[in-house]
From Swiss-Prot:
It comes from Idiomarina loihiensis (strain ATCC BAA-735 / DSM 15497 / L2-TR). This is SsrA-binding protein. It is found in: Cytoplasm. Belongs to the SmpB family. Required for rescue of stalled ribosomes mediated by trans-translation. Binds to transfer-messenger RNA (tmRNA), required for stable association of tmRNA with ribosomes. tmRNA and SmpB together mimic tRNA shape, replacing the anticodon stem-loop with SmpB. tmRNA is encoded by the ssrA gene; the 2 termini fold to resemble tRNA(Ala) and it encodes a 'tag peptide', a short internal open reading frame. During trans-translation Ala-aminoacylated tmRNA acts like a tRNA, entering the A-site of stalled ribosomes, displacing the stalled mRNA. The lineage of its organism: Bacteria, Pseudomonadati, Pseudomonadota, Gammaproteobacteria, Alteromonadales. GO terms for cellular component: cytosol. CDD domains: SmpB. One of its GO terms (biological process) is trans-translation. InterPro entries: SmpB, SsrA-bd_prot, SsrA-bd_prot_CS. Its main location: cytoplasm.
Length: 159
């Protein structure tokens, strides 16, 4: 009898679900994140929150703000752990130039949506996003409810 294969766990560490509701997501980018050792250990333990995070461009470099990485209890006492510090994003120059040009337009911002593992590295999925108005959010909710109703009707009509 062969051994059972270990289940493949998801590579996703944290997700910003609020971003899909608050913004029209347009262009997707994958960025590396410059992290310290204690941050990687905390991310492996799942102590990360990116729900209110966003990206700013400063001096031609991209930084992640608003992401919280809580230090582990057994973290070293001689290292100061700052949970909400700004973290540099590692992007190619062409991607960075595209983000700089697009984010300067009125109504556009750069939002972090997912942090995940790609091999041994933590990667961040960021989107160029345009803010939704409240009526757009209501339209999205109505459309989602209608899709659920349609699925329910089709399910019962087949019987």
């Amino acid at each position: 009898m062969s051994k059972k294969k270990p289940q493949q766990s998801s590579n996703t560490i944290a997700r910003n679900k609020k971003a899909r509701h608050e913004y029209f997501l347009e262009d997707k980018f994958e960025a590396g994140v410059s992290l310290q050792g204690w941050e990687i250990k905390s991310i492996r333990a799942g102590k990360v929150n990116i729900s209110d995070s966003y990206v700013i461009i400063k001096n031609g470099e991209a930084y992640l703000l608003g992401a919280e990485i809580q230090p582990l209890n057994q973290a070293s006492s001689h290292v100061y752990c700052e949970p909400d510090r700004s973290r540099k994003l590692l992007l190619k120059r062409r991607e960075l130039d595209k983000l700089i040009g697009a984010s300067e337009r009125e109504g556009y911002s750069i939002v972090a949506t997912t942090i995940y593992w790609k091999g041994p590295w933590a990667k961040l999925e960021i989107f160029l996003a345009q803010g939704k108005k409240s009526h757009d959010k209501r339209d999205t909710i109505k459309e989602r409810d209608w899709q659920r109703q349609k699925a329910r009707i089709m399910k019962h009509s087949v019987r």
